[in-house]
Amino acid sequence: MIKSNIPIAIVWFKRDLRLEDNEAINSAIASNKLVLLLYVIENSLIQNDHFSIRHLNFIKQSLVDLNQRLAKFNTEILAVSGEVQLIFEKLSKQFLIKKVYSHYETGIDITYKRDKKIAKWFIENKITWHEKRQQGVFRGIVDRKNWSKLMNSFIDQPIKPLPEMKNKLVSLKTLKQIKKNFDLLELKTEHLN
């Protein structure tokens, strides 16, 4: 496997599976780097008591929908199975990852610990991680004195349309080569009775 010296940015989709009004995508496109769209289904998360087959089916259906909409840009989301750090380690052997964009996730302890761990790995590997807010939860504030002000400034922002992405995303041809090195997420959903 030959490493590309072309600097890239990665949009790491977590729970925010949308294209429009997605600050992570807008910022990655504005970075003027080639952008790889990534979704990782984590084995540790699937095995967590909070997760069910319905979650997995929703994720798969959302990825199928997003990929259909991304086809006009000659790309799709690289949807892989594995633990996040191992996935980024593999990608860093193939690309010069400069920046990662994702939303600022709030939720369960397992994802909080994962984010702390991957943040450390990004720093050690000189990768800048930009977490974009997509809702009104603000971690780490001591009291609620300024919460209303923070929340209002967040919700008063205009909805951001999908930016122009032609020739700014990793192509299907390149993705075909990348996929050879990963366990891909099967996007077919299971029928539930």
What is each residue range found by the language model?
Residues 125-127, 146-193:
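Glycine/tryptophan-enriched, flexible segments
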Residues 98-111:
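Acidic beta-strand-to-loop metal/phosphate-binding motif
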Residues 78-94:
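Structural beta-alpha unit
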Residues 1-75:
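N-terminal beta-strand-loop-alpha-helix module at the start
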Residues 43-48, 91-98:
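Acidic/His-enriched low-complexity segments
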Residues 135-148:
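Glycine-rich, charge-decorated loop segments at or immediately adjacent to ligand/cofactor-binding or catalytic sites
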Residues 110-134:
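Short acidic, glycine/proline-enriched helix-loop-strand junctions
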